[in-house]
Amino acid sequence: MSNAALGAAAASTPLFEVRGLRAAFDGKPVLEIDSLRIPEGGVTVLVGENGSGKTTLLRILNGLLEPAAGSVHFRGLPLAGEGRTAARARSVMVHQLPLLFRGTVGQNVGYGLRIRGVPREEIVDRVAGSLEAVGLPGFAPRRATALSGGEMQRVCLARALALAPEVLLLDEPTANVDPGSRSVVERVVRDRARAGGSVVMSTHAMETAYRLCDTLLRLEAGRVVEPEENILRGAVERTDEQFTRFRAGGALILCPARQGQFRVAVVPMDELILSRTPLDSSARNRLRGTVTAVEQTAGLLRVSIDCGVVLKALVTPSAAVEIGVAVGRDLVVTFKASAVRLY
């Protein structure tokens, strides 16, 4: 398929689409995903405990592991066929445990370029640029075996960046690294997304997930489960002795006072109370909005309310009837400042 055709497919289809996916090790199921769409562009973060299936899913998306059943499509092409070539040509996976060859940092970072026949002068430039991007300028002559764990992880990331992939697949890129390396990795991920690239990464560190994600996918025992928190992007307006005021879209949210330049506010869905009129409550956040969607989930209803920013609340069916929840209905959303966490 031509590059033009691939581009047209990418514009109308998700980056990855999974149907009926099953994977097992030693006869034990490790992935059971009936349907999953990973969007093109931005940062998709897979979260879950160790053993939840995050790494297995990434390896399947990269074509490194064949599922026992089901289908995976990359930009509309089956990964079992023509899509595998397209995916491998446009994506790079960085594994959790850094693997470097003997030799210099520059030789490691330039390895993928050399085997692709890239001219030496271009390799030198791209190696220098990718090392600069991960905060390791001038590291090219150093011995790879003399690096710290955080530096090794950053060199592996630089090796991937040198190939200029459209898609980065990162398995626990911030695990077991120093805070400085963690900040660099997070910056690289954000920069890739801002530049129009796609990043699919895994982590069990929720603070990292909240800071980076455009889409959050939670895995439990190999299954995708719905997130139960509102993840709101915005900025701090001001902080006084009692509260930090966080602006998300058209909503101003009060949080416990914290100093810092936070970009994300997280509010659990089950902390939101819906009512037709303002409640007599000590809760400091009271936002008026309009119901835009009502979905069933595990015996509850997930209600979306546009309050200048869309908030989702979990309510019981009986409470929904009592309140009169319906699409188009105006409601008041109430929650405590202490329910809000900033990242």
How does the language model describe each region?
Residues 47-49:
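The feature captures the beta-strand-to-loop junction immediately N-terminal to the Walker
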Residues 62:
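Helix-to-loop junction immediately C-terminal to a conserved catalytic motif
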Residues 70-81, 87:
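Conserved ABC transporter NBD signature motif
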Residues 121-139:
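Conserved ABC ATPase "signature" region
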Residues 168-172:
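Catalytic Walker B motif of ABC-type/P-loop ATPase nucleotide-binding domains
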Residues 250-294, 317-343:
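Glycine/charge-rich catalytic "coupling/switch" loops of P-loop NTPases
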